[in-house]
Regions:
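Conserved acetyl-CoA pyrophosphate-binding loop and the N-cap/start of the following alpha-helix
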Residues: 114, 118-126
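Conserved beta-strand in the GNAT
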Residues: 75-79, 85-94, 104, 109
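Active-site rim helix/loop that mediates acceptor-substrate recognition in acyltransferases
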Residues: 32-86
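Basic, Lys/Arg-rich alpha-helical nucleic-acid-recognition elements, primarily the DNA-binding modules
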Residues: 47-49, 69, 104-107, 129
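Conserved N-terminal entry element of GNAT/NAT acetyltransferase domains
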Residues: 1-34, 38
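A conserved beta-turn-beta hairpin within the catalytic core of GNAT-like acetyltransferases
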Residues: 95-105, 115, 134
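Conserved GNAT acetyl-CoA-binding A-motif
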Residues: 131-141
Length: 141
């Protein structure tokens, strides 16, 4: 009989790391497109285009690296990486509503070849933990 030990908490998964906007935006955009293109509307296509354009704009990336709590692009979040390839993503989009800090968890995506392993669940949990640690009054999915 064989068994596998799974970490009890999401933060114990070595494949999970924080999104690095300086290098991950194009790959995350590709993953989102792969996972959602059959149902993506014009707003979604525009969002992907904005992500890709932002990833090529050095001035924006330098600015955004310090503004992760105030913009709607996914400048913070978590990715799942295997063999130096991003195969999962959960973006965190912070905003304020009547002075309250709120996080939207968006673009939870897992590459089709890596599904049914709990990657999306673990990334979502990590994103929720992040929002909780930032004292968010609400988390929306």
């Amino acid at each position: 009989m064989s068994s596998i030990t799974l970490p009890a908490k999401a933060k114990e998964h070595p494949q999970v790391r924080t999104l690095n906007i300086l290098r991950d935006l194009p790959t995350v955009a590709d993953l989102i497109e792969l996972c959602f293109s059959p149902t993506m509307d014009q707003d979604g296509q525009r969002y992907l285009s904005d992500m890709r354009r932002a990833s090529r704009d050095d001035k924006f990336l330098r600015w955004a690296n310090h503004m992760t709590e105030t913009t709607s692009l996914p400048l913070t979040g978590y990715v799942w990486e295997e063999n130096n390839k991003i195969v999962g993503n959960a973006s965190l989009i912070p905003f304020r509503d009547n002075g309250k800090r709120i996080y939207l968890i968006a673009n939870v995506a897992t590459h089709p070849d890596h599904r049914r392993r709990g990657i999306g669940r673990i990334l979502t949990q990590r994103a929720m933990d992040h929002a909780r640690n930032k004292k968010a009054s609400a988390v929306w999915l």
